[in-house]
UniProtKB/Swiss-Prot annotation:
GO molecular function: actin filament binding; cytoskeletal anchor activity; G-protein alpha-subunit binding; microtubule binding
Region Interaction with ADORA2A and GNAS, annotated ranges: 431-860
Biased composition (Basic and acidic residues): 347-364, 530-549
This protein's encoding gene: Gas2l2
Stretches of the chain forming a coiled coil according to its record: none
Organism ancestry: Eukaryota, Metazoa, Chordata, Craniata, Vertebrata
PANTHER family on file: GAS2-LIKE PROTEIN 2 (PTHR46756:SF14), TRANSGELIN (PTHR46756)
Family membership noted in the UniProt record: Belongs to the GAS2 family.
Name of protein: GAS2-like protein 2
Length: 860
């Protein structure tokens, strides 16, 4: 029974469409608001059970549309009878619409009703084609937007002669009236009817709703919206004015001739929302985060919790926005005091608030590879216990390494190690510095860094420059860049004077746990020179200055003569580190600093008259252990003398003699007047003395004695004779030209086509071993074998003449008559004392003297 009903001819009424649990995009919000308004409008007019969910399902039969068309026609005829003068200025319908009341959804009767309504809107109401829809748009839900816009335009036109209009039409009339008052425009000739009084909205104030929508963007510099009057705002950097109204639960914006939601309007015009999916409130990627907090509060005191930094930012896959956070260059963060029982703490100090740059998007979720393996400070945005979150500017991360942020004083982050925690302080430096790279594995914590800069961590030498009177708590290695990208980098730790006098009660012990905490501060482990002696990895600070000040950063920061008189021992108490070990460490450090500074000043030891020394012009160059500067002279003198004497003279070559057979020409020899010093290289080959005649093709090569000190003047070769012998195609003689002593492959004159080579694939025999399917044993026919012999007969003359390996006696390949045939064709004896390159008309020969078999021949 159920099968019979399921296969009936009459289609069943489709149920409600399945709604997605995912929230709709912001571009569909204004359609939902308009459908709610139109559904309420039709419910008030005809008492229908209609809302935004079943709006299209109620209209798909066309009955409600045709009924409304007939109602508008009746109201227009009544208005024409009451005010004929006003009716003449307004386009009014004259006829109604025929409707089939028995139409069911999806049938042709329903399509006919919708088609009749569309024709009535075009003919009687004069609605533009831009606002019209087709039958398929409503029946198959192809274009819901056109259906909504058409009904809204019909409500605007019908409202002129007394038909109730949707609430959006009334809001439009209010805005138009306000514009006419502001611009002092005359009222329209047929005055529009007075809109009904608006019901008070039970939602929040309009300004609060606008502020709530704008605050979805978590950037410090948000899209500006300035209130001009009630419901009127100026947006962005331009003078664009928008009108905002509240329609039920939606904040609508009057845009052009239609409406849009404020959220969708901001998504299209706010530059931050245009480039970020997380700033859109309707994004289904993740729920919106908490409101942004950009204040950083630091509290010092024994009873206060550890300093925390609260920065809530939304994740975004695209590049960060240009931050505009203005801070004074004199404001600094002093290192907070850890509240551990083993360390002293200062008296409570009032909490200070400092505006900090938000975290870059690439640093909010650190990967395990970005964290340090040592117990030093970590760069992490997640607050774990009492750890302090470090913030790095996303704007400076995208800049060039040598470019400081504009409008701010260049600052240097100096790290102070305290146990397993890492607290970071900020102090200004005169150099142009960058954000430190918080890695011990040569990977940056805030994203990828240039490979040449990260390679400087493995340099065997580090030059340490110490400022006098500096606190040992604020010391950090710094990487000095050279102007040449090919040179390496050199770490230079610079002691910076703190923002205030150091506290005696503070200690800064940051090793691997082998030393206990005490009253003083030990900075000797932060001053170890070589990487193999360091107990933990340091954070390097890249300092890039001008090209002229690169060397001055290392050589002029501190005079090496004053290093001996510098006060090396600080007032501190070490419980685990002995005096001997500490003194040895300082002595080694002092010797290393002096040695490195002497290496850097090696350029000043030479006089100005010596110009051939290879001292780098820019950058910092640190040679390896035991390395010295190259002595002046050496192999460079030969090159300089060769350049001073000028280029050697060249032979004049007749260009007309160079033709197609130019491959067979002998190489021209340098003029005998040039000595070996001009060439700058040793003689590795032998001089060839060649004489070529037009009648005789004999080639003689004479190699002089290798023990001679001077070069033998060779005889200039005639270039015209071999050209004629090599390029003449009518000559049948075997022409042999002079070639190099080096064995080279000759290039064939004509490369055969691969299609002309009869390549037959090798067929594997059958392996099925079935007696009835064995290959045929029929012998080959006799004509086939005769054809094979006839084809191979002309090819038997493959090798005509070859030279013997010892005495140069020609070998007989194809019988005794080959020697006479060779004499007829060659016409001359060939004697070679060097390697010979065969002519193109001859068959290939082996240089060793053994003939080539036909199987060894192959195409080049």
């Amino acid at each position: 029974m159920s099968q019979h009903v399921g296969h009936g001819r009459r289609p069943r009424t489709p149920g409600p469409p399945v709604r997605s649990i995912r929230p709709f995009k912001s571009s569909e919000q204004y359609l939902e608001a308009m459908k709610e308004d139109l559904a309420e409008w039709l419910r008030d007019l005809y008492g229908l059970d209609i809302d935004a969910d079943n709006f299209l399902r109620v209209l798909e039969t066309g009955l409600v549309l045709c009924r409304h068309a007939n109602t508008v026609t009746e109201a227009a005829l009544a208005f024409l009878a009451e005010a004929p003068e006003r009716a003449q200025k307004i386009p009014m319908p004259q006829a109604g619409v025929f409707c089939n009341g028995a139409a069911q959804p999806g049938t042709f009767q329903a399509r006919d009703n919708i088609s009749n309504f569309i024709q009535w809107c075009r003919k009687e109401m004069g609605i533009q084609e831009v606002l019209m829809f087709e039958t398929e748009d409503l029946v198959l839900r192809k274009n819901v937007k056109s259906v909504v816009l058409c009904l809204l335009e019909l409500g605007r036109r019908a409202w002129r002669f007394g038909v109730a209009a949707p609430a959006l039409v009334h809001l439009e009339e209010e805005i138009d009236e306000e514009l006419r008052r502001d611009l002092a425009l005359p009222s329209p000739d047929p005055p529009p009817p007075i809109p009904p009084a608006r019901r008070p909205c039970h939602f929040h104030n309009l300004d609060q709703m606008v502020q709530s929508l704008v605050s979805h963007c978590t950037c410090p510099v948000q899209f500006s919206m300035v209130k001009i009057s009630e419901g009127k705002y100026r947006v962005g950097d331009s003078n664009t004015l928008i009108f905002i109204r509240i329609l039920r639960s939606h904040v609508m914006v009057r845009v052009g001739g239609g409406w849009d939601t404020l959220g969708h309007y901001l998504d299209k015009h706010d530059p931050c929302r245009c480039t970020s999916l997380s700033h859109k409130p309707g994004s289904f990627l993740k729920p919106p985060g908490p409101p942004v907090q950009h204040e950083v509060k630091v509290q010092d005191g024994p009873s206060q919790p550890q300093p925390t930094m609260t920065i809530s930012r939304s994740q975004s896959p695209l590049p960060p926005v240009d931050w505009k956070t203005y801070t004074s260059s004199s404001r600094k963060l002093r290192p907070p005091t850890p509240s551990s029982p083993g360390l002293r703490s200062e008296p409570p100090v009032r909490a200070r608030t400092l505006r900090e740059d938000p975290l870059p998007r690439s640093q909010e979720k650190p990967t395990p590879s970005q964290r340090m393996s040592s117990p030093g400070p970590q760069f992490s945005s997640t607050c774990r216990g009492p750890d302090l979150q470090s913030t790095l500017s996303g704007k400076r991360a995208n800049r060039c390494p040598g470019e400081p942020p504009r409008g701010r004083t260049p600052t240097l982050w100096v790290h102070k190690e305290a146990g397993s925690r890492g607290t970071h302080t900020k102090a200004p430096t005169p150099q142009r510095l960058q954000i430190p790279e918080a890695t011990s594995k040569r990977t940056s914590a805030r994203g990828p860094s240039p490979p040449p800069r990260s390679s400087s961590l493995a340099s065997p030498h580090m030059i340490w420059v110490l400022h006098q009177g500096a606190s040992p708590q604020l010391s950090e290695p710094m990487t000095v860049h050279s102007s040449s990208p090919g040179k390496g980098l050199t770490k230079i730790p610079i002691r910076l004077s703190p923002a205030r006098p150091p506290t005696p009660g503070r200690s800064s012990l940051g090793t691997e746990g082998e030393y206990s905490t005490g009253r003083g501060s030990i900075s000797s482990r932060a001053l170890e020179g070589n990487l193999d002696r360091s107990t933990h990895g340091h954070h390097s600070v890249e300092a890039s200055g001008d090209h002229q000040t690169d060397i001055q950063t290392t050589s002029e920061t501190e005079d090496p003569r004053s290093l001996g008189t510098q006060k090396w021992k600080e007032r501190h108490t070490s419980l685990a580190l002995g005096r001997r070990r500490e003194q040895a460490l300082y002595d080694n450090l002092k010797e290393e600093v002096v040695a490195n500074m002497k290496l850097l000043e090696v350029g000043t030891a030479y006089t100005q008259g010596t110009r051939s020394q290879a001292i780098p012009r820019s950058g910092v160059y640190v040679p390896s252990l035991g390395g010295r500067w190259p002595e002046p002279g050496g192999p460079y003198d030969k090159v300089i003398r060769e350049l001073v004497q000028g280029p050697p003279p060249l032979l004049k070559v007749d260009l007309k003699a160079w033709k197609v057979g130019s491959e067979c020409l002998p190489r021209p020899i340098v003029d005998p007047g040039s000595p070996k010093e001009k060439l700058g290289s040793r003689e590795t080959g032998t001089r060839i003395k060649a004489s070529l005649n037009a009648e005789d093709t004999t080639v003689r090569t004479v190699s002089p004695a290798r023990g001679q000190g001077c070069s033998t003047p060779p005889v200039s070769a005639n270039l015209e004779a071999p050209t004629r012998s090599c390029s003449d195609p009518s000559s049948d003689k075997a022409s042999v030209c002079l070639g190099k002593g080096k064995r080279t492959l000759r290039k064939p004159q004509k490369i055969p086509s691969i299609y002309k080579l009869k390549l037959r694939p090798r067929i594997r025999p059958r392996r099925d071993h079935r007696p009835e399917k064995r290959p045929s044993r029929i012998p080959k026919p006799l004509p086939y074998s005769c054809l094979v012999l006839a084809r191979t007969a002309p090819g038997s003359r493959l090798l005509k003449a070859t030279l013997g390996g010892k005495g140069g006696v020609p070998c007989q390949v194809n019988g005794t008559g080959k020697k006479e045939e060779e004499k007829k064709k060659g016409g001359s004896n060939i004697s070679l004392e060097s390697s010979i390159q065969p002519a193109e008309s001859q068959e290939p020969l082996k240089l060793g003297g053994t003939p080539l078999s036909p199987e060894e021949e192959s195409w080049v």
